[in-house]
Amino acid sequence: MAGWFSSASPLDEQVERATSSSLEDIALNLEISDLIRSKSVQPKEAMRSLKRRLENKNPNVQLATLKLTDTCVKNGGTHFLAEIASREFMDNLVSLLKTEGLQLNTEVKEKMLELIQDWAMAAQGRMDLSYVGQTYQRLQEEGFRFPPKTQISGSMLESSAPPEWIDSDVCMRCRTAFSFMNRKHHCRNCGNVFDAQCSSKTLPLPHLGILQPVRVDDGCYAKLTSKAAQSSGLSDRTSFKNNSITKSSAMEPRTARAEGGFDDDLRRALQMSLEEAQNKGSSGYVPQPKVAQEPPKPSGQPTAEEEEDADLKAAIEASLRDMEEHKQKHAAALKNTTSETPSHQPQNTTTLPKNPYELSPVEVENIHLFAALVDRLQHQPPGTILREPQIQELYESIGTLRPKLARSYGETMSKHDTLLDLHSKLSTVVRYYDRMLEERLSSAYSQHSLGYGSIPSGPGYPNVYPSMPPTAEGKAGAENFYYGNSVVENPLTASNPQYPQAAPDMMSREKDTHARRPYEPQYVYTALHSLSTTILQWNGAPATDLHSPPPSANVP
């Protein structure tokens, strides 16, 4: 009798099968999320179906329903996220957490808190999902204990869904007006409106969760079939139309193709890295194992993997070539060293101590490879790292190098400090040496400029000064005549032992002249000659003795 008044929808039946108390059916969960994303069912209806399933008293059913809800949130599209973030659904979760009569199962409660926290962190910055963050903050203030936070990107909630339909009075391709005979048709791929002539093609849209052939316009049909032809190698578009159901795997989204190509290259690189890491323990040079060449593929159009991952392959090949060149150079250097070393003098050969904390080229290459893989995984879906256990093995092998790397870094820093100390000492020594050179040069120059010595003997120098008249007015008159001064009225007599007061003035002038002019031998001899001539004039010598050597008497 109850079946006459209530009938379960197909979605309710699928939700009931997916949330049964048995093991989780991931394939059925993804199928339900595709139905929601393709808008085959209304998002509010799907939300209420999950809400009713959470009212079940069986903890296993509740856990399965929460997992199904999380799968639909991540793959159901924006229109379903808006229903999950509504007050109707979030307040129902809060009421289940605050149940007083019958205590909620511990695992169910922890799973609810974990999902609310993850959804709130992923929905940060989105106004249409703000109620999830408000609910999360309110539960924190009320004292609910959430699990440790995990960094979740907002891209977790991004999934492709069919676009909203756009209305128009004319066809958006041929601009023909719609009428009673010319009806409107919407393209499921772009959401624009067309007439029957411009939208007569049908295609499945797996990237939008639509696996059955649906109506698309001519422009979208050309784009999708051209991509399918490049990925599957088909040249005829009609063959894809007739076999669209059986060959729907060829219409995978671009992200899936890129992920497949990345997995193959990643697996190949990890295998080579692990082989090198296993061989690093043996002593001596270990040649790199030759990679078995794959059989040549039939010539044709390039596959999607080669198109999407050409940069990654080129980087891996360049890295392998560099490693091979380094190993060949190392082997050649070892061979030359062995050939040049005489075999009959083993006691004279000395080998440099090898640093036990120095990283080998293979270890350095593994570190660079792991860094490149981690950087590449940041742009991949979250589940990529879980499908490749080789990454964990590479991480463990690199983790053992951390003490070695730290010790090597410490020794390098100590060497750096030692070299800086030596550099400062060397700079100080060079500065002292330069100062000593400057002091010696200055002292030598001063001694050479002050100590002229005696005038060498030889032919007399020509008299560049005019001869004194025979009736000179004494020594003062000769001095005045020499310097061009006026004649003193009271000249000194021969009996006066006092020297004229102009002599210090003359000496200062001679010193100034020596300081201003450069050091030249002819000028030195001329200056000495003029000085001796003046002294002879003071002593009353005749004018004919001006060119003779100076007297040996001490001049005051």
Curated annotation (Swiss-Prot):
SMART domains, per the entry = FYVE, UIM, VHS
Q: Which Gene3D superfamilies match?
A: 1.20.5.1940, 1.25.40.90, 6.10.140.100, Zinc/RING finger domain, C3HC4 (zinc finger) (3.30.40.10)
Query: Can you name one GO molecular function term for this protein?
Result: zinc ion binding
Subcellular location per UniProt equals: Endosome membrane
Which residues fall in a compositionally biased region of kind Polar residues? 232-249, 335-353
Q: Which GO terms describe its biological process?
A: protein targeting to vacuole; protein transport to vacuole involved in ubiquitin-dependent protein catabolic process via the multivesicular body sorting pathway
Main subcellular location of this protein, as a coarse class: membrane
Kinase recorded as keyword: no
Q: Which GO terms describe its cellular component?
A: endosome membrane; ESCRT-0 complex
Query: Could you tell me which InterPro entries the record lists for this protein?
Result: ENTH_VHS, HGS/VPS27, UIM_dom, VHS_dom, Vps27_GAT-like, Znf_FYVE, Znf_FYVE-rel, Znf_FYVE_PHD
Name the UniProt key words of this record, in alphabetical order: Endosome, Membrane, Metal-binding, Repeat, Zinc, Zinc-finger
Task: Report the membrane topology from the UniProt record.
Answer: Peripheral membrane protein
* Function per UniProt: Component of the ESCRT-0 complex which is the sorting receptor for ubiquitinated cargo proteins at the multivesicular body (MVB) and recruits ESCRT-I to the MVB outer membrane.
Oligomeric form and interacting partners: Component of the ESCRT-0 complex composed of HSE1 and VPS27.
Q: Return the protein name.
A: Vacuolar protein sorting-associated protein 27
Q: Where does this protein come from, organism-wise?
A: Aspergillus terreus (strain NIH 2624 / FGSC A1156)
Which gene underlies this protein? vps27
